[in-house]
């Protein structure tokens, strides 16, 4: 049967020994080289690739923040036009302080999973900016910023407090007041009724209390939304600070202590409201500065309690269980 050779010549047979000699392939010309190999021979491309590889870590974070500029523009407008409280600036400042404190420890090789998540969230925030509510799109954008920061931070930094600060940087107090303000006022009024009933004749109707014949309304500032924000902000900041001295403190420790933070905030808001209502029911017409003094005193006590909860030394866990 004849043998057909496609594309390659048949092997040569030695006349003396009858052995089949391997066919030598012709040397490759530059046209046969892979495209990447040809690019690597271009000096300009190599120097450009080296400059990208040696770019400082802060430059990538700055580029990520620049890509999210529509979100920051919207946040600035919402904070400055009076439609929301500018407390989110504190959370952004805390994230900036965290990055600055670890500027010499930023990873030269970022964690690819978090970097991919940052890129995906950035694309999602850009694509949905005109299709989702502004607050939802901003949430995705700030999660992208947090994921990018986590990608470059040292592995020992807890992830959960960083994500928490990114959420708290949103201008969301007005939205929380709209959706959760009334339920919180009802819960606060009912808890205050239990405490006041020991000394006064109290009845509750919605978010209002009838104390000894005096109608006292638990208004929006008494809902505790701002105390909730400040409480969780304190928890995130103290957790990141505590971890500098207690390496066993991780994201799991932070999450397991969050319920205690919620309880402290709720108790503090109930105590503040009870003191103010008791003063009004007793005929003490407290001035505005007295209301503020009571509120700030209770807030300071709540934040101190949260700092104590988050600052407790964490038990040392096995390496496989740390996050």
Give each language-model segment a name.
Residues 2-14, 18-323:
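Hydrophobic N-terminal alpha-helices or hydrophobic patches in metabolic proteins across all domains
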């Amino acid at each position: 049967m004849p043998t057909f050779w496609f594309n390659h010549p048949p092997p040569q047979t030695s006349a003396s020994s009858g052995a089949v000699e391997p066919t030598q392939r012709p040397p490759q010309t530059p046209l046969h080289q892979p495209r990447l190999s040809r690019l690597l021979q271009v000096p300009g491309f190599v120097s450009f690739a080296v400059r990208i590889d040696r770019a400082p870590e802060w430059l990538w974070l700055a580029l990520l923040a620049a890509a999210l500029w529509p979100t920051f523009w919207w946040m600035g407008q919402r904070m400055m036009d009076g439609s929301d409280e500018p407390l989110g600036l504190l959370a952004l400042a805390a994230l900036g302080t965290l990055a600055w404190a670890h500027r010499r420890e930023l990873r030269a090789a970022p964690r690819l999973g978090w970097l991919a998540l940052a890129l995906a969230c950035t694309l999602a925030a850009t694509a949905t900016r005109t299709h989702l509510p502004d607050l939802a799109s901003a949430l995705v954008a700030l999660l992208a910023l947090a994921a990018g920061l986590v990608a470059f931070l040292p592995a020992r930094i807890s992830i959960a407090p960083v994500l928490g600060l990114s959420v708290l940087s949103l201008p969301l107090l007005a939205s929380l007041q709209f959706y959760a303000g009334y339920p919180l006022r009802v819960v606060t009024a009912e808890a205050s009724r239990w405490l006041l009933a020991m000394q006064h004749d109290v009845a509750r109707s919605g978010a209002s209390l009838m104390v000894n014949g005096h109608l006292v309304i638990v208004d929006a500032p008494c809902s505790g939304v701002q105390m909730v924000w400040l409480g969780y902000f304190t928890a995130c900041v103290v957790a990141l600070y505590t971890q500098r001295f207690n390496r066993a403190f991780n994201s799991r420790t932070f999450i397991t202590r969050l319920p205690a933070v919620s309880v402290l905030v709720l108790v503090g808001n109930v105590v503040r409201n009870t003191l103010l209502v008791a003063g009004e029911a007793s005929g003490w017409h407290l001035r505005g500065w007295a209301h503020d003094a009571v509120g700030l005193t209770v807030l300071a006590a709540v934040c101190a309690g949260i700092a104590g909860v988050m600052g407790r030394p964490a038990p040392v866990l096995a390496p496989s269980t740390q996050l």
